[in-house]
Each structure stands twice: as C-alpha cells, then as structure tokens.
Amino acid sequence: MRESCDRAAVVRQRDVLWSWLPLALSWMLMAAELPALGAVVARLADPRIHLAAYGGGVFPLALIIEAPVIMLLSASTALCRNRASYRALWRYMMVMGGALTLLHVLIAFTPLFDFIVNRVLHAPPEIVEPARVGMRIMTPWTWTIAYRRFMQGIQIRFGHSRLVGFGSAVRLITNLSVLSFGYFIWKGPGIIVGTAAIAAGVTAEALFSHIATRPIINGALCTADSGLPDADVGLRAFLAFYIPLALTSLVVLLVNPIGTAAVARMPRALDSLAAWPSVVGLMFLFRCSGLSLNEVVIAMLERPDSRSAVGQFSRRLSLFVTAAFALVVLTPLGLGWFTAVQNLSPSHAQLGVTALFFGCVLPGATVLQNWYQGQLVYA
C-alpha cells in the first residue's frame, strides 16, 4: 500500500514541502474568498454599511458558531484508520453539525439575534438589519464546513491531499460566480451578494468532498492497516480527545466577536468595522500557510525520524511568512492593496494599514502554533 511505503522512508524537508503545498494552496484559495467578497461589496451600493454588517455582525457570529467543528479535520486525520472508526466519527460529525446549525437558526431567526448584536456586540444601528439578512443566508455554513472538513481529513490521511486543493478551487469558483452575477447582472445589496456567495461556495465544496472521498471510503479505508493500534472512538474517548481541540479553536475564534464588540464601542466604529473584512482577509492570506501545517504534522509524525525535518521546515516557513507580511505592511503595497484591489476609501485604507502593524507577528506565530498543536494532537 502507498501509505505503508511512504511511512517506511525517512522524511526529508522536501517530503514535508510536497505534503504541505497542496494544503497550503487549498487554504490560499479559500482565503481568497474574503478579499473577493470585500472587493465586490465595496463596489455595490452603500459599501460602508454592508461591509460593516458583514465584518461586525455576520462574520464574527458565524465563525464562533462554527468553531467547535473546525478541528474535525485534525480528528478525522488522526482517528479515521478503518471503516469502524470512520462510521463512529461520521455520527459524531453529523450530531455536532446538526446541533450547531440549529443554534445558528435560533440566533438568525429569533429575537436572540437582536440581543446578541445590540446588547453584546453593541453594533451600530445601521448594520443590524443587513447583518440579520446575512446571518439567515449563511444558515448552511456550519454543517457544510463540518462535513467537508471531516471528509478532507480522510483525504489527507490516505495520501490524497491534492483533493483538498481541488475542493477549495470548486469553492472559490462557485464563490466568484455568485459574486460576478451579483455585481455584473443583479447589482443587489452587498450583504446578500456576499453571504450568498460564501454559502454557495461552502456547499459546493462539501458536495465535491463527498463525491471525491467515496472511492477512498469504499477502497483504502476498508482495507486499511496503518500499523498503528485501532483508535478508541467510543463516545467517552472521543470527547476526551476532541473537547480540548474544540475549546482551542473556540478560544482562538472568540477573538473575532470580542474584537468586534470592542471596536463597536470605540470612536469611528462604523468606519473601523467597514475596514475590518479587508484587514482580516489580507492577514488570513498570510496566516493560511501556517493553518495548513497542522494536519501535515499529524500525518508526518507517524513516519520514522520525521520530527527534525518537520520542525526545521516549520521554523523556516515561520520566518518566511513573517518577512513577506512585513514587506506588505512596511511598504506602499499595503495601502495599494486596500485602495486599488479592495476599493476602500482613503480614510478606510489608512485605518487598514494601521491595523496591519499590530498583526505583524501573527503569520509566523500561526506556523509555530500549528507545529506544536500538531504534535499534541498526534500524541
């Protein structure tokens, strides 16, 4: 079996690179959707209101609801060793996705939304109704992400990382198609165009992941012999394994609603929230190289003498992305990105550049965080 042969060889940095690259490209394709959304919404009617509605309402709420399913990718990569473990994890994924989707519906379609947005986030009144519409359109978001991350973990474990990149390409193409329709033909409200594009993209990616993973499930997964003991995927063991991972992503993603609530209480709140999606989008483009490392570490550490090569690769990658991000922040490239590509007003663009200074260490730190996190998950 290919998997067994790969594990028998000593790992070199080149091996880590070729394992990481498809995932990194996948994350970059996914990261491109937020700048694309910002660029289109900024060119439709009332861009200040609709960008702020997405950045200050829809995005932080949808992200925090989704947070518990983020680490299904790591769990699937680590635990889906055979048909029995696949079936157990599939049930857990469906329960989590369904429960969190129900929570999303309760927030988006009941007065709970008003309490959270007005009282907790303290959002400017102008963005409340557009944000409500956007949250309702984003209803498929959590379940589809849970499903595709679970399937992508299986793809990574059985040596088909390139399928993750293909899925991200499907997502981006769908996203751009909806954005193009909204901008060139319909010219509707920016919040509707943007959130419809995001929801359609993740749904298309989940469908592709389902189709692409079926041959693996019916083939390699059924006959898998990883050389490792069977994973204990009983409910109690799974919760003991997964709850720390879910709490990690929850704590990390809590930064978004906490940051939104803080910004909404400061001077120039509406302007800051309008610039926020473009700032987050650019930072995410640089951080995704580190976010894609976690599953590579988990998979590589099962091979002999791999720790040194993976660790050295992680340190070099951290230095590289830090230098690349600093180049954008400390030169006119940053201002040019916000004005020419994102179509922000000069005042919003200057806000964005100032914000980037405070995030200079994040891309490199994200790489190192995922190197250590991958080791903990493997252990």
Name what the model sees in each region.
Residues 45-46, 84, 121-123, 156-159, ...:
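Short helix-loop-helix connector
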Residues 49, 87, 132, 161-162, ...:
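Residues that define the loop-to-transmembrane-helix transition and helix capping
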Residues 35, 39, 150-154, 176-181, ...:
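Alpha-helical transmembrane segments of multipass membrane proteins
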Residues 91-93, 158, 166-173, 180:
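Long, acidic/polar, low-complexity amphipathic helices and coiled-coil-like
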Residues 21-74, 243-303, 328, 359-366:
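Transmembrane helix-bundle signature of multi-pass secondary active exporters and lipid flippases
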Residues 53-104, 148-156, 275-329, 333, ...:
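Small-residue-rich hydrophobic transmembrane alpha-helices
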Residues 70-77, 137-156, 164-172, 194-210, ...:
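Short runs within selected transmembrane alpha-helices of multi-pass transporters and secretion channels
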Residues 1-23, 77-141, 181-243, 301-362:
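Short alpha-helical transmembrane segments in multi-pass integral membrane proteins
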